[in-house]
Amino acid sequence: MKRILYVLALLILTNGIWAQKTIIEEIRKDKNISGGGYYAYPYPEHPLPSLTPAPKGYKPFYISHYGRHGSRWLHDAKQYKLPVESLTKADRYGKLTPRGREVLAQLRQIQEESKGRIGELTPLGARQHEGIAQRMTKNFPEVFRGKGLIDCKSSVVMRCALSMLNEVKVFQAFNPRLHVKADASQSDMWYMVYGNEKANELERQARDNELAAYRRNHMHLDHFLHALFTDTKFAQDSLDIQNFTGNMSAIISNQQSHDTDVSFWDLFDEQELLDNWLCDNAFWYVARSSSPISKGYMPHLAENLLRNIIESADKAIADGTCQANLRFGHDACLMPLVSLMNLGDYGAIIDDLEDLPERNWWLHRIIPMGGNLQLIFYRKKKSDDILVKALLCENEVTFPIPSDLAPYYHWSDVRDYYLKMLTP
């Protein structure tokens, strides 16, 4: 019996080590993955996902979508300001390495360029959405034919509206006869961008407790500090090291949002690259997914959105006037939606944050900059059977129900499953 338990324990440990090796291997291939939620949308720079052909006779006729805005500037000016102040202080005392002085000069330039741009969409972010729309029209041209309606709605935040407009111009160029509506109204935010104080309080509690403990266990700063400071004790004693490293992590991770050759990934060794990813990954699982730490509450933030998706699809199927409902918002809305729908098992309940990597709960595959969910609806002549396929960041993902045609599912089954789940 003891031998069996030992073997089981060894298998569990080995699986955990294997999972971390897997994500390390991913990061070795592309250090930008370390940025987690800052990860720039990977296509077309990476090989495009292959799509399973539809069953014989079925053609796409409708798309329902929710997308995160594209790559952006950081959303708080302090994220640029505070690292400059910290490094300037260290420089006054002669405590910076040559690389540290170079980083300070680069950060001053970045801070200057950020003025008036905080939180705004970058040119790369605009191109990401152009590419997403172009592939949508290429993969599903039937949806964008004729004179039908493409109904686009956006968060009232400018970067989301601009993300929407960069897709709109692609649809209009593809087929000028389309009726493309684009709107950004506070009247739609009750389902487009929903949050409440309960979620905020659960997030605050987790930040102060479980997430703080997790970060302490995954904060290896030796290489990072030695790269910047000649006296790391000075840095730890004289600077607000937690705020400094947090803001530096944001800048380093978000450099990929810009068309620039300036990179700071060399400041991290391999363990620190992994830690950077692990901490962001854990944060998002707790803050907007199914974590027991946040009482499994966060997916419920997307209930209004899921109802809107179902009701909009019902209307499109019934009257045939709308060919696509496209919604443009934020990571904090897309994540709860994917978790609520449990697409690709991303709504899994995982008790231990250390198990996230081995369970393939990988943030950068869910909500990178420009991340999106596309539900593609299919039908065939002389049949009432509607099929639906889910694409998460253009990759086929499963619904949490059986299907004889996976990755295609009978819409009636999907609809019934989610309506029962939404019923109080």
Residue ranges and their predicted role:
Residues M1-I23:
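Bacterial Sec-dependent N-terminal signal peptides
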Residues Q20-D151, S155-N325, G329-P424:
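Signature for phosphate-centric chemistry
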